[in-house]
C-alpha cells in the first residue's frame, strides 16, 4: 500500500530550481502582502463598508488561503532531494483546494450578482444587498465549498494505491492522483468531470451571461455615468477569466496535456491570487484612494510614535 506520494515538481535542473525558488518566493510574498492589504484597507476605511468591498475582502482571504495550500510546500520543495507528501497530507491538500476553490466560485458569482443589482436594479440595491444577505452569501459560499470538497474527497479516499506513487505536479489534486490507483478509473474520471467540470463550466457560463447583460445595460447610459461602472466591471471580468480559464481546462477538458496542466496549475494557484489585488487596486479609484489614506495614517502614526 502506498503511504506517500512523490512530486516530480516543475523542473529537474538544480540551477533552474534555484531561480524558481527565488521567483515563487517573491510571488508568494506578493500574494500575502497584496491580499492582506485589500482586507486591511476594506476593514479600516468606512467608505468601503459596502457589499461589493465586503465580498472583495472575502475573495482576497480565499485567494490567500488557496495559494497557501500549495505555494509554501512548492517553495520549500525546490531544495528537497525527494519532494514527498504523506497519503493523509495529499488528501488534506485535495480537500482544502476544493474547499477554497468551490467557495471562491460562489463569491465570484455573488460579486457578479452584486454588480447586476447595482447597475440594472439600482433602486432595489440596498434592499436586496443588505447586511444579512452578505452574511448569508458567505455562509452559502463556505457551505458549498465544504460539500464540494467532501464529494471530491469521497472519490479518492477508498481507492487502492499499491503501485506508482509519482505525481507529475507540485501538489495533489484529484485528476492526477486517481490516475495512480490500482484499478480502472474510467468511470471515476467521468464522475470527476461531471462534478468539478460541470460546476466550473456552469458557473462560468452564468457569469458570462450576467456580465453580458450588465454591459448591454451600460451601453444605453451616458458616458460620464457609465465610465466608473465599466472600470469596476472590467476588473471583475478580468478576475473571472483568470480564475475560470485554468479551472475549465484542468477539470472539464477531457484530453489533458501534461505540460499545459503544470502551467495552468501554477497560474491557478499562484499567478491568479497574485494578480487579483493588482487588478482591483489599479482599476478601482475608491481602493486607490483608501490605500493612500491608509499610508498617510500609517506615516502619521509612525511620526507620533
Curated annotation (Swiss-Prot):
Membrane topology designation: Multi-pass membrane protein
Pfam families: 7tm_4 (PF13853)
Stretches in topological domain Extracellular: 1-18, 73-93, 152-188, 252-262
First-listed, main subcellular location of the protein, grouped into a coarse class: membrane
GO CC annotations on file: plasma membrane
Top-level taxon of origin: Eukaryota
Residues on Cytoplasmic side: 43-50, 114-132, 213-228, 283-305
Membrane-spanning intervals of the chain: 19-42, 51-72, 94-113, 133-151, 189-212, 229-251, 263-282
The keyword Isomerase belongs to this UniProt entry's keyword annotation: no
Annotated keywords: Cell membrane, Disulfide bond, G-protein coupled receptor, Membrane, Olfaction, Receptor, Sensory transduction, Transducer, Transmembrane, Transmembrane helix
Paired cysteines (S-S): 90-182
Subcellular location: Cell membrane
SUPFAM superfamilies to which the protein is assigned, alphabetical: Family A G protein-coupled receptor-like
InterPro entries, A to Z: GPCR_Rhodpsn, GPCR_Rhodpsn_7TM, Olfact_rcpt, Olfactory_Receptors
GO molecular function, one term: olfactory receptor activity
Function: Odorant receptor.
Family, as annotated: Belongs to the G-protein coupled receptor 1 family.
Protein name in UniProt: Olfactory receptor 4F17
Amino acid at each position: 500500500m502506498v503511504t506517500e506520494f512523490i512530486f516530480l515538481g516543475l523542473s529537474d535542473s538544480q540551477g533552474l530550481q534555484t531561480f524558481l525558488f527565488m521567483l515563487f518566493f517573491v510571488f508568494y510574498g506578493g500574494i500575502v502582502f497584496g491580499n492582506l492589504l485589500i482586507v486591511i484597507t476594506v476593514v479600516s476605511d468606512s467608505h468601503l463598508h459596502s457589499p461589493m468591498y465586503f465580498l472583495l475582502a472575502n475573495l482576497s482571504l480565499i485567494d490567500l488561503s488557496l495559494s497557501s495550500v500549495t505555494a509554501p510546500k512548492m517553495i520549500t520543495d525546490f531544495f528537497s532531494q525527494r519532494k514527498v507528501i504523506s497519503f493523509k497530507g495529499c488528501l488534506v491538500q485535495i480537500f482544502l483546494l476544493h474547499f477554497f476553490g468551490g467557495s471562491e466560485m460562489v463569491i465570484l458569482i455573488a460579486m457578479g450578482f452584486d454588480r447586476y443589482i447595482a447597475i440594472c436594479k439600482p433602486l432595489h440595491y440596498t434592499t436586496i444587498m443588505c447586511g444579512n444577505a452578505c452574511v448569508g452569501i458567505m455562509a452559502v459560499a463556505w457551505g458549498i465549498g465544504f460539500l464540494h470538497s467532501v464529494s471530491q474527497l469521497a472519490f479518492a479516499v477508498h481507492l487502492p494505491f499499491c503501485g506508482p506513487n509519482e505525481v507529475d505536479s507540485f501538489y495533489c489534486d484529484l485528476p492526477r492522483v486517481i490516475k495512480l490507483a490500482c484499478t480502472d478509473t474510467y468511470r471515476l474520471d467521468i464522475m470527476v468531470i461531471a462534478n468539478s467540470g460541470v460546476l466550473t463550466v456552469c458557473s462560468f457560463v452564468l457569469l458570462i451571461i450576467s456580465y453580458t447583460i450588465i454591459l448591454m445595460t451600460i451601453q444605453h447610459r451616458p458616458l460620464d455615468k457609465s465610465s466608473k461602472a465599466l472600470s469596476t466591471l472590467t476588473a471583475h471580468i478580468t478576475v473571472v477569466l483568470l480564475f475560470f480559464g485554468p479551472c475549465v481546462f484542468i477539470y472539464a477538458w477531457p484530453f489533458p496535456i501534461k505540460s499545459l496542466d503544470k502551467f495552468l496549475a501554477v497560474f491557478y494557484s499562484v499567478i491568479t491570487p497574485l494578480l487579483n489585488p493588482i487588478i482591483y487596486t489599479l482599476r478601482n479609484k475608491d481602493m486607490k484612494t483608501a490605500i493612500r489614506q491608509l499610508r498617510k495614517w500609517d506615516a502619521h502614526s509612525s511620526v507620533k510614535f
